[in-house]
Amino acid sequence: MQPGSSRCEEETPSLLWGLDPVFLAFAKLYIRDILDMKESRQVPGVFLYNGHPIKQVDVLGTVVGVRERDAFYSYGVDDSTGVINCICWKKLNTESVSAAPSAARELSLTSQLKKLQETIERRTKIEIGDTIRVRGSIRTYREEREIHATAYYKVDDPVWNIQIARMLELPTIYRKIYDQPFRSSALEKEEALSNPGALDLPSLTSLLSEKAKEFLMENRVQSFYQQELEMVESLLCLANQPVIHSACSDQVNFKKDTTSKAIHSIFKNAIQLLREKGLVFQKDDGFDNLYYVTREDKDLHRKIHQIIQQDCQKPNHMEKGCHFLHILACARLSIRPGLSEAVLQQVLELLEDQSDIVSTMEHYYTAF
């Protein structure tokens, strides 16, 4: 939890909010931050924490106040950082209890169900001092922030196991997710394209790599030499853009090189990024400097599919399928010793998209 981290100078366009996984999740936040978050100027009912759009939260705390109304309970929940009002709707009794049962057996069953329901309600009744978990949407009522619950329940936690687990979990979630500013890759790409001269060398290299990937996919290129990419006008214009130099790296000498040498270097680095993602690869250790596009190498797809299909017939792989590392080892033995994990992962995803193979569990694949 960082003071002032909920403020964001410029809101991300609401059309891009769906790219942030926090937007669709029940965010586990401290109550203090829920109370301090600023409401979006674009969409009422959506709040911003460090640029992350949040409309649903998950809180765990102690009940410090109870008010009952005809349709709902109002619980004051305290997690030691703040207190927030939670509106928890009563369950509607849809069964008609006034209808007279037609037989003694039905009378007995009805009375037993009624007693069971009363017992459950009595044991789950929430009172001051109880621990409660609430998941719901954030609302503002009479200028006070509150949570309208979609689900809530009393937590049986006599030795504080659940509360301690939450206390240990939240700092990690904040550090890895909430305190990392939300930046949409689509927005960054749009900004970069509109003003490529404002990029440093790594950012320009990354952008060139993305544009090269789009070019290869749109034109269904099967293989290429680096020099061929350097002749594509749109890519060449992008590579020729000036860059912001970093004084603490070797980038300061980038523009001192000859233009052709600098362009060759940035294209080489951009292709290397594609190789690291498994989108392109080289055969025979790259002696001929020819790159192959993973998506278009049908022969590689067929061989990987055959490995999975054949090994899944063996007794030790029939139930769960073949593990990723087993497929990788077989592929390196029968196809190419230098096959990378990234390339294999790309091939497996393509085969799965085509329904040639199925993922039975994490990292396990089978073919029919």
UniProtKB/Swiss-Prot annotation:
> Keywords for this entry?
Chromosome, DNA-binding, Nucleus, Telomere
In which residue ranges does the UniProt entry place its DNA-binding region annotation? 57-155
Region annotation Winged helix-turn-helix (wHTH) 2: where it falls in the sequence: 296-368
One Pfam family per UniProt: Stn1
Family indicated by similarity: Belongs to the STN1 family.
Location of the region described as Interaction with CTC1 in the Swiss-Prot/TrEMBL record: 1-185
> Where are the disulfide bridges?
none
Q: Which GO terms describe its biological process?
A: telomere capping; telomere maintenance; telomere maintenance via telomere lengthening
On subunit structure and binding partners, the annotation says: Component of the CST complex, composed of TEN1/C17orf106, CTC1/C17orf68 and STN1; in the complex interacts directly with TEN1 and CTC1. Interacts with ACD/TPP1, POT1 and POLA1.
Protein's UniProt keywords contain Nucleus: yes
Report the PANTHER family cross-referenced here.
Answer: CST COMPLEX SUBUNIT STN1, REPLICATION PROTEIN A-RELATED
* CDD domains, per the entry: hOBFC1_like (cd04483)
Where found?
Nucleus; Chromosome, Telomere
Protein name per its UniProtKB record: CST complex subunit STN1
Chain segments carrying region Winged helix-turn-helix (wHTH) 1: 191-295
Q: What does this protein do?
A: Component of the CST complex proposed to act as a specialized replication factor promoting DNA replication under conditions of replication stress or natural replication barriers such as the telomere duplex. The CST complex binds single-stranded DNA with high affinity in a sequence-independent manner, while isolated subunits bind DNA with low affinity by themselves. Initially the CST complex has been proposed to protect telomeres from DNA degradation. However, the CST complex has been shown to be involved in several aspects of telomere replication.
Give GO MF terms, alphabetically: single-stranded telomeric DNA binding
Cellular component aspect of the GO annotation: chromosome, telomeric region; CST complex; nucleus
